[in-house]
Every structure is written in C-alpha cells, then in structure tokens.
Design a protein with these regions (language model features):
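Compact, glycine-rich, soluble single-domain proteins
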Residues: 1-99
C-alpha cells in the first residue's frame, strides 16, 4: 500500500472476479485500517483496527467465507459509521458508498 495517511471519508475498494475466501495482510501499510469483507454488498466479516506491518511476517486477516469485495477505510471509521456484520452497502459508480 505504501500510504502514510488516508483522507477522512476515503477508502480503497477491491472487487474480485471470483467469489472466494480472501486473506488480507498489511505489509508496507503505515496506518491502521478497518477491513470490510462483503459478498453481494452484504458485510460478511469486519476486521477493526488492523495493525500496520512494516516487517515480515505480517498477520493475515481472513474473510472467513467466500466474498467478492473488500473495502479498507481508516481505523475507527466502521465504529463511527456503526457498521456491523449483516449490514448491506450500496456502491455507486465505484466512488460513492452508501451505508
């Protein structure tokens, strides 16, 4: 990732071609993040405050079940937005996410 900051209310979205179990690590990530794992716009797992990792080995965070999308946002944002497993997210134009 190599980011040292992420603007408030910004994030990164990763859309996968295939529905599968996804493991995310934080190698070369300098800031803590909340990782949201989704399938069909439904939150299936949520890792809050995933720690930065600058040296291997790094902890891996699993979706625990097959998913098709991952969203990474600033640590703490999922609590501020009151996100929880089972919530649905609508994604418009690949840039705006409605909670």
């Amino acid at each position: 990732m190599h980011r040292k900051f992420l603007d408030k209310n910004k994030g990164m979205i990763f859309i996968y071609d295939k529905v599968e179990i996804i493991n995310i690590w934080m190698y070369n990530t300098y800031i803590p993040l909340d990782i949201i794992f989704l399938k069909n716009k439904n939150i299936k797992n949520l890792k809050k405050n995933a720690s930065p990792c600058l040296q291997l080995p790094c902890e891996s965070y699993s979706s625990r079940e097959p998913i098709d999308t991952v969203i990474e946002i600033n640590a703490g944002m999922s609590d501020q937005l009151k996100l929880k497993i089972g919530d649905n997210l609508e994604i418009f134009s690949g840039t705006n996410i409605v909670f």
